[in-house]
Amino acid sequence: MINLRKTHPLMKIINHSFIDLPAPSNISAWWNFGSLLGICLVIQILTGLFLAMHYTSDTLTAFSSVAHICRDVNYGWLIRNLHANGASMFFMCLFLHVGRGIYYGSYLYKETWNIGVILLLTVMATAFVGYVLPWGQMSFWGATVITNLFSAIPYIGQTLVEWAWGGFSVDKTTLTRFFALHFLLPFVIAGLTLVHLTFLHETGSNNPLGIPSDCDKIPFHPYYSIKDILGLMFLLLVLLSLALFSPDLLGDPDNFSPANPLNTPPHIKPEWYFLFAYAILRSIPNKLGGVLALLASILILLIIPFLHTANQRSMMFRPISQTLFWILTANLMTLTWIGGQPVEQPFIIIGQLASILYFLLILVLMPLAGMFENYMLKPKR
């Protein structure tokens, strides 16, 4: 009998992508995050769908509709907590996935990497519009502050902001369109994920050594499917622990108050996963300069493949580059901490130094380290 999964037009695609896919034999747990991101996306779409059934995108009822979901809908509290904390897990996996790509030189698959950066931007946009929906104080003021950044664009800025708002301030029209975007964008993310996978399967996965592995491949199933299930168990353990024991740990207390345009919170800040970029934005006193630095902090990922100077792909055997990578990691954690602090000394100067170091590491120090390591590895006569 002919094996159906190898002949059926639809099952053949699934078979080539998830069952008989040739995978390097030495990829570590750092390669688990791609599948975990896919699972996070499915969790977010499903919980979001159930929330959308009860949510109302109207300024008068949005806040109370979220309270209604938590109090009156069967397991509404659980669905809402899973959705809110699922976003945090999504970004945690995203940052680890990007970090692994930088450490092991996966960015040299340029098409896969560039689609990945576009995916990151799309997920960030989705999370931003989603944060506005509960219509709490931080939702309203976060939307006001971040959308106002478009006004820094010369000549068309203010017109652009009012066009995005649908009026002269963040109001009912803004909330309605943000809800529409928040519902639509996850499906765009799902589509881009398929493109991301298509490009990845053109080249095959990278591996910790950063060397071609065509001579030593193993089938994805059962080896890596089992490994991915282990990763899934860890993900669900952390997500459920967060959602059931401390669902508000990563949220902002100000968001428990309904949006009030007449009362500004003492310290406006986004969710934790945007704080590093927010700290870079705030570290520049000029508005346009801050917006450009904010954009550059993410878009800099697009030029990383062109800054690769080392003869070796992976950082596994490059101790100087490794040190700089972990300094970059610590620097990003510092920026995240600074983004959550009020705008006063010593936080201002720490934020400015960390922002300078962030760009310096990626644009100058890491390429120089690659060149120096090439020189050190050159056989001496």
UniProtKB/Swiss-Prot annotation:
Location(s) in or outside the cell: Mitochondrion inner membrane
GO biological process, one term: mitochondrial electron transport, ubiquinol to cytochrome c
Binding annotation for heme b b566: 97, 196
InterPro entries given in the database record: Cyt_b/b6_C, Cyt_b/b6_C_sf, Cyt_b/b6_N, Cytb/b6-like_sf, Cytochrome_b, Cytochrome_b_C_euk/bac, Cytochrome_b_N_euk/bac, Di-haem_cyt_TM
SUPFAM superfamilies in the record: a domain/subunit of cytochrome bc1 complex (Ubiquinol-cytochrome c reductase), Transmembrane di-heme cytochromes
Xref: Pfam families: Cytochrom_B_C, Cytochrome_B
Ligand binding (heme b b562): 83, 182
One GO MF term attached to the UniProt entry: metal ion binding
Keywords: Electron transport, Heme, Iron, Membrane, Metal-binding, Mitochondrion, Mitochondrion inner membrane, Respiratory chain, Transmembrane, Transmembrane helix, Transport, Ubiquinone
Domain of life: Eukaryota
A single Gene Ontology CC term: respiratory chain complex III
Transmembrane segments: 33-53, 77-98, 113-133, 178-198, 226-246, 288-308, 320-340, 347-367
Membrane topology type: Multi-pass membrane protein
Binding site for a ubiquinone: 201
UniProt cofactor note: Binds 2 heme b groups non-covalently.
UniProt keyword Kinase, yes or no: no
Cofactor(s) the protein requires to work: heme b
Oligomeric and partner information: The cytochrome bc1 complex contains 11 subunits: 3 respiratory subunits (MT-CYB, CYC1 and UQCRFS1), 2 core proteins (UQCRC1 and UQCRC2) and 6 low-molecular weight proteins (UQCRH/QCR6, UQCRB/QCR7, UQCRQ/QCR8, UQCR10/QCR9, UQCR11/QCR10 and a cleavage product of UQCRFS1). This cytochrome bc1 complex then forms a dimer.
Family as reported in the entry's similarity comment: Belongs to the cytochrome b family.
More details: Heme 1 (or BL or b562) is low-potential and absorbs at about 562 nm, and heme 2 (or BH or b566) is high-potential and absorbs at about 566 nm.
Function as written in the Swiss-Prot or TrEMBL entry: Component of the ubiquinol-cytochrome c reductase complex (complex III or cytochrome b-c1 complex) that is part of the mitochondrial respiratory chain. The b-c1 complex mediates electron transfer from ubiquinol to cytochrome c. Contributes to the generation of a proton gradient across the mitochondrial membrane that is then used for ATP synthesis.
Protein's recorded name: Cytochrome b
Species this chain originates from: Sminthopsis ooldea (Ooldea dunnart)
Lineage, opening ranks: Eukaryota, Metazoa, Chordata, Craniata, Vertebrata
Gene that this polypeptide is encoded by: MT-CYB
